[in-house]
Amino acid sequence: MKTSLRRLRGVLHKHESKDRRDLRALVQKDELAQASQDVEDMRDCYDSLLNAAAATANSAYEFSESLRELGACLLEKTALNDDEESGRVLIMLGKLQFELQKLVDKYRSHIFQTITIPSESLLNELRIVEEMQRLCDEKRNVYEGMLTRQREKGRSKGGKGETFSPQQLQEAHDDYENETTLFVFRLKSLKQGQTRSLLTQAARHHAAQLCFFKKALSSLEEVDPHVQMVTESQHIDYHFSGLEDDDGDDEIENNENDGSEVHDDGELSFEYRVNDKDQDADSSAGGSSELGNSDITFPQIGGPYTAQENEEGNYRKSHSFRRDVRAVSQSAPLFPENRTTPPSEKLLRMRSTLTRKFNTYALPTPVETTRSPSSTTSPGHKNVGSSNPTKAITKQIWYSSPLETRGPAKVSSRSMVALKEQVLRESNKNTSRLPPPLADGLLFSRLGTLKRRSFSGPLTSKPLPNKPLSTTSHLYSGPIPRNPVSKLPKVSSSPTASPTFVSTPKISELHELPRPPPRSSTKSSRELGYSAPLVSRSQLLSKPLITNSASPLPIPPAITRSFSIPTSNLRASDLDMSKTSLGTKKLGTPSPPLTPMSLIHPPPQALPERADHLMMSKQERRI
C-alpha cells in the first residue's frame, strides 16, 4: 500500500515539472513572436523617415539651383536699366538670391546631420537585434530537434536512433534561453529609445529650420527698405493681393467642398474650358458644313448677305476637316463673295493663286464629243452677260472652259459690245478642232490690254476689275454663230485644201484657223491676244511682248458656205484655192497660235449695227 502511494507521488511530481517546462516554452515563443513584430515596425518607421529626409534634401538642392539661376539672371539684366537706382536694387536682389542659395545648402547639410545620419545609426542597431533574433531561432531549432529525436527513440521497438543524455538536453535548453533573453532585452532597450531618438531628431531638425529661416529673413529684411523706396518712387505696388491673406485656409476648404479650382484673388487665370467649348462648337459646325458640301465640285458664289467678318472664319472652317473627311470635291475651297473688297484686289489674289498652280489648258482630241470634267463651269456663270455685256466679257475672258448654252445671237440688232460678248461666249463652248472658216471672216475681239490665259483648275466666281478698256484693238478671226443648237453636215473641201479635223461639228463650235507661214510662227507666240489657249506650256510661260507690226494671215481653203456668218454675207466665190500655202504636215499640230493683225488705220470708235462691216476684203488681207 505504501509502495503504490510512493509511485503515485513520483508520477505526480514528474507531470508537474513537465508542465512547467511546457509553460515556459510557450512564454518564450510568445515573446519571440512579439519581438519579431516589433523589429518589423521599427524598420518600417526608420525606412519611411530616411525616405522623407532624402526627398527633402533633393528638393532643397533643386531650390538652391533655382535660386542660383535666378540670381545670375537678375545680375545679367541690370545693364538694361538706365535708372541707376533701379539697377542698384536689381544687383542687391541678385546677390540676395546667392545668399539664400548658401543658406539652403546649409539647411540641406543639416538635414543629413539631424535625420539621415541618426536614422541610419538606429537602423544599424536594429540590424544587430535582427542578427540576435536569427541566433535565437537557430538555438531553438537545435533544442527542439534534440527533443524530437529523443522521443522517437523511446517510441521505437528496436531502440535505434541517436541518444542524448539529459545533460546535453539541458545544455541546449540553456543556450536557447540565454539567446532568447539577450534578444528580448536588446529589443526592449532599442524600442524604449526609439521615442527618444525620434524626438531628438525632430528637435534638431527644427533648430536647423529655425536657423535657416532666421538668417534668410534677416537677409531679406536688409534689402526690403531699398526695394520699398524704389517701388514707391516708381508707383509700384509690390504687395500683391493674397500675399498676407489670413483666410487662405478657409478659402481652400471652401473650394474643396465646392469642387471649384478658380480663385478670385486677382491672380492670372488659365481657364480655357469655355473657349474649348466654343471651339468645339465651331469645329462641329465647320465639319457639318464640309460634309454637306463634299459633293460640290465647283466654287459657289456667296449670297449678297454675306458679311465681311465671316470671310476669314469660313475660309478657316473649309480647311478644318480636310485631313479627316475624304470629300469628292477636288476644287478650291469655297470663298464667299466680299462686297467691300475692291475688284482689283480680288483679281490679284485670284491671279496669284491660279498662276502658281496651273500653267496651261490642254485641248481635248477631236473624238471627244462630251465635255471633260475640268471644262465644266461653275453654276455662278449661268446668268452672266445678259444684263451687262461689259461685265460679262471681263468675267468670262479668263476661261477656256465651255460655258452654258445661250440663245441665238442677233447680229443685226446688237451693238459691238454685244457682238464681242457673243463671240467670246461661243468660242468657249467647244474645244474640238473644226474646218477653217472663210478668209473674210475676221472680226474684232474684245477691247483692252488684259492678258487672257486659260487654266484647267477650278473656276471661281469672283469678277474681274471693271476698269475701262483701252481703245487699242487687235483683230481676231473666228465665227459668229447663229444657231448653237442645230448641227451641220461634214464640210467637203477641194483636193488641194488642207485636211480638216471634224467630229460632228456644231454651229457653235470654234473653227480652227490654218497655221500661219513659218516666218511669223516665232513672233506669234509672244502676242497678247488668243481666241483660245492654243499654245504649248513653254510658249505660254514666256513673257509676252506687245508689238504693233503687221503679219498677214494666209488664205484658207475655199468652203461652200460659212457656219458662223449669215448666208447673205457669204463670199465663197471670191476664194482662190490655188493660193493655199499650208500643207498637211503643219496642220498636224494640235493648237496652232493665231497671229493678230495690227490695223493700218485707227479703229473706228463705233461700228455700224450690221455685221457686213465686220468683214474685210480679200485685197486688204493680201497686203
Curated annotation (Swiss-Prot):
Superkingdom of origin: Eukaryota
KW Coiled coil (keyword) present: yes
Composition bias, Polar residues: 328-343, 384-393, 496-506
UniProt keyword terms in alphabetical order: Coiled coil
Biased composition (Acidic residues): 243-259
InterPro entries assigned to the protein according to its UniProt record, in alphabetical order: AH/BAR_dom_sf, At2g33490-like
Low complexity: bias regions: 364-379, 484-495
Ranges of Pro residues composition bias in the record: 590-606
Coiled coil start-end: 24-51
UniProt keyword Amino-acid biosynthesis present: no
Annotated region (Disordered), positions in chain: 148-170, 240-343, 362-393, 454-531, 585-607
Protein name as annotated: Uncharacterized protein At2g33490
Organism expressing this protein natively: Arabidopsis thaliana (Mouse-ear cress)
Lineage: Eukaryota, Viridiplantae, Streptophyta, Embryophyta, Tracheophyta
